[in-house]
């Protein structure tokens, strides 16, 4: 956990050719500076990936060691207000300590599943009480996964609210999400092997969700 941001840095550079502290548009730099000052946080490390898939994501421990990564697709597909809305969403994750919160929360189902596996690793030597504990742990594991999904969705809503609050432009975020959804769908098939669109764990939108958006629109 302590070294995970540094490992992610290496993965981003090695597989996605991310460039950190790369020059970003002046309007975006000014926007990030303003949000950081208003929320008492350090200016994050900004990563840039030369990938046509529009995406952005945040990782790190706290708001003071956050990394925000954006792709070329974000800057090309969205207008200035929409780019600020997307980056505002990612800054919201950092301000609310979402990276740390979700990492700790996700340890619960891992622990419960570990208990279940221990209790059923050797059925011949397990007592009835051990098996009962294992069954209870597995049920709690299943329930905890749904709770994690709910928590994750709640954090996303909070990040959306933060973005709207700092940009004063709810339409920009809504339009950006639609454009990102369509952009991920149209670029997915032509993407190279190591494209950020292939990772659903990272990003403001995953490619599977974007396909649903296109079908519904």
Label each residue range with its predicted role.
Residues 32-36, 152-169:
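An active-site-proximal "capping" alpha-helix that borders the catalytic cofactor pocket
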Residues 27, 82, 103, 154, ...:
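Alpha-helix N-cap and coil->helix boundary residues
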Residues 9, 32, 70, 89, ...:
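Divalent metal-coordination and catalytic microenvironments
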Residues 91-110, 170-171:
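Catalytic Zn2+-binding segment of zinc metalloproteases
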Residues 1-55, 106-150, 181-185:
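Hydrophobic or amphipathic, alpha-helical segments that drive membrane association/targeting
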Residues 38-65, 163-217:
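Active-site-proximal gating segments in proteases and membrane effectors
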Residues 69, 79-95, 100:
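Short alpha-helix carrying the canonical HExxH Zn2+-binding catalytic motif
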Residues 56-80:
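Active-site scaffold of zinc-dependent metalloenzymes
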């Amino acid at each position: 956990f302590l070294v995970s941001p540094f490992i992610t840095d290496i993965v981003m550079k090695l597989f996605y050719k991310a460039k950190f502290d790369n020059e970003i548009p002046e309007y975006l730099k000014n926007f990030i500076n303003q949000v950081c000052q208003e929320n008492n946080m350090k200016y994050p490390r900004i990563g840039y990936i030369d990938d046509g898939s529009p995406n952005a994501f945040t990782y790190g421990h706290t708001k003071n060691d956050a990394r925000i990564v954006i792709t070329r697709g974000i800057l090309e597909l969205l207008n200035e207000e929409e780019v600020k809305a997307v980056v505002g969403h990612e800054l919201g994750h950092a301000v609310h300590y979402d990276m740390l919160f979700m990492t700790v929360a996700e340890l619960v189902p891992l622990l419960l599943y570990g208990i279940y596996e221990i209790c059923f690793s050797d059925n011949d030597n397990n007592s009835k009480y051990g098996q009962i504990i294992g069954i209870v742990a597995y049920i709690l594991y299943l329930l905890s996964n749904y709770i994690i999904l709910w928590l994750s969705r709640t954090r996303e809503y909070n990040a959306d609210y933060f973005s709207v609050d700092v940009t004063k432009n709810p339409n920009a975020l809504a339009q950006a999400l639609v454009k990102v959804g369509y952009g991920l769908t149209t670029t997915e098939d032509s993407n190279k092997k190591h494209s950020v669109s292939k990772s659903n764990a990272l990003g403001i939108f995953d490619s599977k969700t974007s396909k649903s958006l296109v079908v519904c629109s």
